[in-house]
């Protein structure tokens, strides 16, 4: 079942995480987010000072991004600083190498293990990907597996590679409760009339 344009907009983290993003581009992202009626903006921690007083928009940022190879202490410090700077939500990237070292090398088992670890750690959401890996971003198989694993106890954020209305709808149908998008306008403009 397809959800409406407005319902989809309320699921979007309007995202700008490019390493070359400028303050002017972040300000434009915020203005566009307000215009589109999305749930939140997601920016790099260094851009958080530009996000003061965005209510009703929420502010998300990243931690350990994009590789996840930071130490736990570094991630904790980064998360604390981001929270102090006003982040409502933090997307923390796990260390895939550590996950693989203790588990079989099967991707499905790694995804399930990561979802369970996130739940045990008290996370509110699990996220498919950063969108920065050469292998691509979210896919419906991973979203469905994650949604089945967390079974409504956590949200599922599909992120990376979602560029059109139909793909966004497929992610929601697969179980995504949030969408991390840099192409929000194009996707919402692709909604059926």
Predicted regions and their residues:
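Alpha/beta enzyme core
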Residues: 2-36, 40-41, 46-156, 164-186, ...
